Amino acid sequence: MENAHTKTVEEVLGHFGVNESTGLSLEQVKKLKERWGSNELPAEEGKTLLELVIEQFEDLLVRILLLAACISFVLAWFEEGEETITAFVEPFVILLILVANAIVGVWQERNAENAIEALKEYEPEMGKVYRQDRKSVQRIKAKDIVPGDIVEIAVGDKVPADIRLTSIKSTTLRVDQSILTGESVSVIKHTDPVPDPRAVNQDKKNMLFSGTNIAAGKAMGVVVATGVNTEIGKIRDEMVATEQERTPLQQKLDEFGEQLSKVISLICIAVWIINIGHFNDPVHGGSWIRGAIYYFKIAVALAVAAIPEGLPAVITTCLALGTRRMAKKNAIVRSLPSVETLGCTSVICSDKTGTLTTNQMSVCRMFILDKVEGDTCSLNEFTITGSTYAPIGEVQKDDKPVKCHQYDGLVELATICALCNDSALDYNEAKGVYEKVGEATETALTCLVEKMNVFDTELKGLSKIERANACNSVIKQLMKKEFTLEFSRDRKSMSVYCTPNKPSRTSMSKMFVKGAPEGVIDRCTHIRVGSTKVPMTPGVKQKIMSVIREWGSGSDTLRCLALATHDNPLRREEMHLEDSANFIKYETNLTFVGCVGMLDPPRIEVASSVKLCRQAGIRVIMITGDNKGTAVAICRRIGIFGQDEDVTSKAFTGREFDELSPSAQRDACLNARCFARVEPSHKSKIVEFLQSFDEITAMTGDGVNDAPALKKSEIGIAMGSGTAVAKTASEMVLADDNFSTIVAAVEEGRAIYNNMKQFIRYLISSNVGEVVCIFLTAALGFPEALIPVQLLWVNLVTDGLPATALGFNPPDLDIMNKPPRNPKEPLISGWLFFRYLAIGCYVGAATVGAAAWWFIAADGGPRVSFYQLSHFLQCKEDNPDFEGVDCAIFESPYPMTMALSVLVTIEMCNALNSLSENQSLLRMPPWENIWLVGSICLSMSLHFLILYVEPLPLIFQITPLNLTQWLMVLKISLPVILMDETLKFVARNYLEPGKECAQPATKPSCSLSACTDGISWPFVLLIMPLVVWVYSTDTNFSDMFWS
């Protein structure tokens, strides 16, 4: 039934053709069940395991690798001789990597879809209904309830469907609907129509929503919606319809994969076409097909060389390390890619209750009467410190602590707070915190009594459990609570009837009253001044109400409660307590004692975090279900708004937002910093608008109502104390529910991205080098310098370790003083592409050069000519060009070993270059990142392992090297450092001046002291002797060029 909240009870019952006392007939139930189905949320049809596995192979890079593995496998199948076993190593290793990646991907996907299933925990199992087949109430399975059913609900029940209340059988009905609306206190319900058809859920005071809990009272109602038509069902549909966005990093890697695949395809085709003339060479037995297959194998090797196989593993490792660091800061990351997304967050949409505030109602101000003279009076105003339920804080007057027992008015005020109260404090030993037992408002009063300690109770030596209610217990020992007159909407107050535990002539029964100031003060005839009772005059009443109005509408927007006493109430037997309409008669002729002002206070550390966000160029938007006045007041206190800032176009209620045109709504999302009284649909709409501006949005939430927006935003952040639905729909969970933790996580995300950029570039330059190497050997007609299994080893192991270590680079000191990076900013800029292309070309040329050196100039090598080397495929005994040359020498493992050793060594030097994007190694020595030094040592040790430990040399088709050969490797490798230092110098001084923190604002002088400033002399002293020794030793290097 649409808009049931706007209809009268009679209209709703008439719509379903049902009587409240008898319920539906079995025939009606059958028809309604056929029409509306079961009252349950349908199970989400998840993807099958096969679908999830296939999905993991949709990535372009993965598909290219898979194709390369399949082709390698087919080629290995037809391999002959000794190479048969080693030929299978390459496809096997590639497939192993792909399977491992797929397993990780499937595991993450499985976790992600739990959010929709978690909604089922809010479905009650049973419900109590009236139906015509039985004369009394009957318990049935909640899934069998249909629209039109008459349902009975009482305290402790979970509401089984969306229900329009028809009658309330207790004084009041309170409902905890925080999971759905985010309201921090339980809501009082009534049966009157709410005429507004566009009312938000918070304002539908005559409706009960499926999955919410009855906090107090008993009532009956008619079911108006079941299953997916309930409010919680609509949230489920919204979550199902929400597609998960790919993170900026995933998008960048997708783009990179596309570009790389095109480049790889072009180079592979080019290599194959260049060598068409060699297809008929004698080495292939004169068979054109054999020659074509041989060069096709080289093209496949090229594809393997060009793809950074280690990149997914290194990225996963780096993100996993980042999650561990975040976990130490109380941010538990559920989705690895979201770690990096945090780094480019430009908007944080934060819930108010529990995130920006403590969600622990706290009395912060109170007043009692000091003096009264006719129509004028003066007040004693007090402030109270402490912003949690912990009974720690003090009462201050004019910023100085006071002893409360010195004020009679405060003693009576504390007595009312303790006795007119059904809540208590409890110390949770497991969590180590004080928690509320009962209502938030009443717990705040209990905590206030503990801070006041009006009877000067000795508190030292008490355990934390005993301390929780020590002062309240002293007051409760003095008077006994006989009965309670429950809160009702008409009088807006509640009271308790108390008698002294030790009767005497002076002590007598009293009624203590608390409630909304306008309701209580209108029924006060007197005011308490010290221990005396003075008549209430219009002037005094006006003064009291003006202070209360100021507290309620000022910068604090406090929730005020008036506290009063009835000194001479009727005796219990004279009261008619069966009818709650009589309660107001017994709460008249009251004496006003004082007033307390409370609020859900902002967390202490939030203001500094909001300031840090502003410095970092991140906009903070508060989105709350609370009312606008309270929301704006908290915004002012934490710095989202300035104290006197005009919030006309910067703060909206859900209703005001709905009334705007679509273009005005877009503009509102661009400028607003506060949305109050909102529903789940508003949150999702706000996220959509922000995403249309290319903003990267982090959304916080804890309730079921937050789940769709958490899932839709780039970063969904759930509270540790939140619902299971919110947690499973989000990428990150805050263990301490603290906004400041988000800011710390953003900082960590930025540092991770910077480091990730370094190792991605490092791996790419390595792959460029491998591609250039294979392309050069094919173009020059040289024997293979590197084979696929060697390239896999380099890409996965020897490159992977330093790349992972680069994730430990220390973050920049000014990382939170820069605006968020543009998510569309390329991973590699034009200059950096040129830089790494230049380095890559040197890596490739050096690798080919090392292999050529062994053939042409090395002692112990064949010393063939360049022509013979470039036409080695024509080598046979009867060819005069190869007279005296043993053709088997062209299959020697030495040149491959030289090429592989140069490639590994040069990559270690390149890792040192990647320590900083633009800073010189002379100023930032390797030990700035000790993990990098360790990983380089480990990579070189692994290289020695495959060189010198049998049978590894056989698998990798390499052989041990002697000292001269190692010196040659170093001679060829070390210049890459000089080359990158030159490119860094150009970047620092001509292309990106001022980007480095160390860069001086003025042009540096050319004096020797200025040039040597900041140089790490220990590094210079360490490296210089090595360089001199390497380059002073003769290795026949020049013979290669003069032969």
UniProtKB/Swiss-Prot annotation:
Segments on the Cytoplasmic face: 1-48, 111-253, 314-756, 808-827, 917-929, 985-1043
Catalytic residues identified in the record: D351 (4-aspartylphosphate intermediate)
Subcellular location: Endoplasmic reticulum membrane; Sarcoplasmic reticulum membrane
Positions of post-translational Phosphothreonine modification: T441
GO molecular-function terms, A-Z: ATP binding; ATP hydrolysis activity; calcium ion binding; enzyme binding; lncRNA binding; lutropin-choriogonadotropic hormone receptor binding; P-type calcium transporter activity; P-type calcium transporter activity involved in regulation of cardiac muscle cell membrane potential
Class of the enzyme per the UniProt entry, highest EC level: translocase
Subunit structure: Interacts with sarcolipin (SLN); the interaction inhibits ATP2A2 Ca(2+) affinity. Interacts with phospholamban (PLN); the interaction inhibits ATP2A2 Ca(2+) affinity. Interacts with myoregulin (MRLN). Interacts with ARLN and ERLN; the interactions inhibit ATP2A2 Ca(2+) affinity. Interacts with STRIT1/DWORF; the interaction results in activation of ATP2A2. Interacts with the monomeric forms of SLN, PLN, ARLN, ERLN and STRI1/DWORF. Interacts with HAX1. Interacts with S100A8 and S100A9. Interacts with SLC35G1 and STIM1. Interacts with TMEM203. Interacts with TMEM64 and PDIA3.
Identification of the protein by name: Sarcoplasmic/endoplasmic reticulum calcium ATPase 2
Gene that specifies this protein: Atp2a2
